[in-house]
Amino acid sequence: MHMPFSFKYKPIDTIRNQCIRILVVLLFLLVTCIHCMAESGIEDLFTDTFSVPGWKVDGEAYRYSPQSLYEYINGGAYFFIGYGFVELTGANVSPVTGENDAVAVDIYDMGDKLNAFGVYQLRKDSQAPSLGIGTASFGSNDYLVFHKDRFYVEIRAFFSDRKDQGVLENMASNVAEHLPGDNSLPKELAYFPEKEKIIGSERYISGGILGHAFFDKGLSCDYHIKGKKVTAFIVFLPSVRDAVRSVKRHKTFLKQSEKKYLPLEEFGKHSFISEEPYYQKIIVIQEGARVIGAYDLNDVEAGKTLLADILRKIKQTTAKQK
């Protein structure tokens, strides 16, 4: 005998939505676990591996997120957040002798090498010699900065009397030795050809190349070409569509500034030459999800050669990384 029974069907959309919610929760838990492991690893640096003769860590390490960083450095938080800041882990260090001296060691996790490099380049003293710590470093008797991999590190001293710079260098070396990652520079710096480049002029900019919001994040580098300083830049966009849109917005800006632009079809249909307000001639080209250019040009042909070399270097570097 057939026994009828009722079965309540759920719409497919409802089931799909529930699955999506479950996946989101699982992904959140996974990211949280990974993040927690990363946090504990940096904290261990102050508990298990910090070893500087005559100095000890006071209490527990402190930690700040993008939401709370302003509590520690007030208005300076916006600068770091603009460069992809993930988390700050730090600790206070004092002499084992009980003197009133103090040192603050702050480790900024910037998410990736490019962000850490960008922060360091904008904070560094161009006149100060490198100390050979991490990827690059500089410092004085009471202040030392270095970057390594995705980390940017500041060490600030509050000494009651003048002390040898070696104190901070020992601390920085100890921290650098135990930070994860390597001392290599961001791979994107290889996009700039070496010929006529001004050594050390590379910068990673967050907040607008040439002050343009539509050129938000990218690299710039200075060159000496025929006795004139020229700046090349590479803007990184999320997609080809975004890159094309940025070029169009640039053209709109130039038109509003009463600057004419002429197409450069040899570099593609979205490439042009113009004059940027407050600068000399500028060449802009779009290549994939990048916008590449050079400004302060007094020799257009030399500018074209430089951009052609940059395009070649990008293709070569990208091919090696595959």
Located regions from the model:
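Bacterial N-terminal signal peptides
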Residues: 23-33
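Structural recognition of the beta-strand scaffold that forms the well-ordered cores
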Residues: 145, 152-155, 284, 291-294
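Bacterial N-terminal signal peptides that target proteins for export
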Residues: 4-23
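Surface-exposed amphipathic alpha-helical segments
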Residues: 43, 159-189, 297-322
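A short acidic-to-branched-hydrophobic micro-motif
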Residues: 81-121, 153-155, 220-246
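Short S/T/G/P-rich N-terminal loop/turn motif that feeds into the first structured element of a domain
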Residues: 223-230, 287-297
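Boundary at the C-terminal end of the N-terminal hydrophobic targeting segment
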Residues: 36-38
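Short Gly/Thr-rich strand-loop-strand
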Residues: 49, 54-82, 100, 110-149, ...
